[in-house]
């Protein structure tokens, strides 16, 4: 049988840093108010780079690190809710920029679960035997979706990208998987609506910026995500002691605290970087993974079991246990 493995990781964030104190100068908030509620102290905001620019930086790094030629890449999946445009896809721009002429490319929209969903799909593509090498990138410029007068949401989000290179392997590395969607709760977190504008349409005001029912999302993350992780471990016969690190979507420090208690995994196994990046949606998990590899916490030698878990708009949530 053919399986997939993560062979390379990379990330990139825009240079411009926006601190909580910077935000306090343009809206009614303070560093203490933001940090005590979220664990976020600063975030990177793009000045002129689009989502594709961030993703291209990651793709270039992955290629360089791997030593592969661009035409050896079979597919590129970009998980994003903030594409440059609805057409062409962000992934198509990445494919062109790195000259991966043999690759097919497409975007995936699953909000903050996007990277996990895309990684699960990429694993199946390689397991089919038809493809050998693929890139999965989470990239966001959420700054263009934020209402900068709304302190409840503007303080949360940042821009950035992270990704992995998947290669075919004779050993199984994706050990367990669970993916979920509950569209009935979709109005809890929305953004980027468009209006009907033909001569035959009745106008409807669209919600362009991010709007969130914070309490509903907080409760969802604690209840549904924790339950699905516990179920996943039970079904796969993987215990909490088997897990080396937990890399969850970086939405809020208090969410991580509560999920750690719910699933009874030591809090120190939960890596975090939201203090420096905020919530970067589909980019948060791969950025966290890339930094952990840089720091030597995760070795990419196939000896560690890592829980990856994303959750967000849709509502969507999903987890993978991978051997890295």
UniProtKB/Swiss-Prot annotation:
CDD domains: KAS_III. Homodimer. Residues 250-254 are annotated as: ACP-binding. The gene is fabH. It comes from Streptococcus pyogenes serotype M3 (strain ATCC BAA-595 / MGAS315). Gene3D superfamilies: 3.40.47.10. It catalyses: malonyl-[ACP] + acetyl-CoA + H(+) = 3-oxobutanoyl-[ACP] + CO2 + CoA. Keywords: Acyltransferase, Cytoplasm, Fatty acid biosynthesis, Fatty acid metabolism, Lipid biosynthesis, Lipid metabolism, Multifunctional enzyme, Transferase. The active site is at residues 112, 249, 279. InterPro entries: ACP_syn_III_C (IPR013747), ACP_syn_III_N (IPR013751), FabH (IPR004655), Thiolase-like (IPR016039). GO terms for cellular component: cytoplasm. Catalyzes the condensation reaction of fatty acid synthesis by the addition to an acyl acceptor of two carbons from malonyl-ACP. Catalyzes the first condensation reaction which initiates fatty acid synthesis and may therefore play a role in governing the total rate of fatty acid production. Possesses both acetoacetyl-ACP synthase and acetyl transacylase activities. Its substrate specificity determines the biosynthesis of branched-chain and/or straight-chain of fatty acids. PANTHER family: 3-OXOACYL-[ACYL-CARRIER-PROTEIN] SYNTHASE (PTHR43091), BETA-KETOACYL-[ACYL-CARRIER-PROTEIN] SYNTHASE III, CHLOROPLASTIC (PTHR43091:SF1). It is found in: Cytoplasm. The last Arg residue of the ACP-binding site is essential for the weak association between ACP/AcpP and FabH. Its EC number is 2.3.1.180. Belongs to the thiolase-like superfamily. FabH family. This is Beta-ketoacyl-[acyl-carrier-protein] synthase III. Its main location: cytoplasm. One of its GO terms (biological process) is fatty acid biosynthetic process. One of its GO terms (molecular function) is beta-ketoacyl-acyl-carrier-protein synthase III activity. Pathway: Lipid metabolism; fatty acid biosynthesis.
């Amino acid at each position: 049988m053919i399986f997939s493995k993560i062979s390379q990781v990379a990330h990139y964030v825009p240079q411009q840093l926006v601190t909580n104190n910077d935000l306090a100068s343009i809206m009614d908030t303070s560093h203490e108010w933001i940090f005590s509620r979220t664990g976020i102290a600063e975030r990177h905001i793009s000045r002129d780079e689009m989502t594709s620019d961030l993703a291209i930086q990651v793709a270039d790094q992955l290629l360089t690190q791997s030593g592969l030629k661009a035409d050896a890449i079979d597919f590129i999946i970009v998980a994003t809710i903030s594409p440059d445009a609805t057409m062409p896809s962000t992934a198509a721009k990445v494919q062109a920029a790195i000259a991966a002429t043999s690759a097919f490319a497409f975007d995936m929209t699953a909000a903050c679960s996007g990277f996990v969903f895309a990684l699960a799909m990429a694993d199946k593509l390689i397991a089919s035997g038809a493809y050998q090498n693929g890139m999965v990138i989470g990239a966001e410029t959420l700054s263009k979706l934020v209402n900068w007068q709304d302190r409840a949401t503007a303080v949360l989000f940042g821009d950035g990208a992270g990704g992995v290179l998947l290669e075919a392997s004779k050993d199984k590395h994706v050990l367990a998987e669970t993916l979920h969607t509950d569209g009935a709760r979709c109005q809890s977190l929305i953004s980027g609506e468009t209006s009907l504008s033909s001569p035959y349409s009745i106008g409807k005001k669209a919600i362009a910026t991010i709007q969130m029912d914070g309490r509903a999302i907080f409760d969802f993350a604690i209840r549904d995500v924790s339950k699905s992780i516990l179920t996943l471990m039970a079904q796969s016969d993987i215990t909490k002691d088997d897990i080396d690190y937990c890399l969850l979507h970086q939405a809020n420090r208090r969410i991580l605290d509560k999920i750690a208690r719910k699933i009874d995994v030591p809090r120190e196994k939960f890596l975090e970087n939201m203090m420096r990046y905020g919530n970067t949606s589909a980019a948060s998990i791969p950025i966290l993974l890339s930094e952990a590899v840089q720091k030597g916490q995760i070795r990419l030698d196939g000896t560690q079991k890592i829980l990856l878990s994303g959750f967000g708009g849709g509502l969507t949530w999903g987890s993978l246990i991978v051997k890295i």
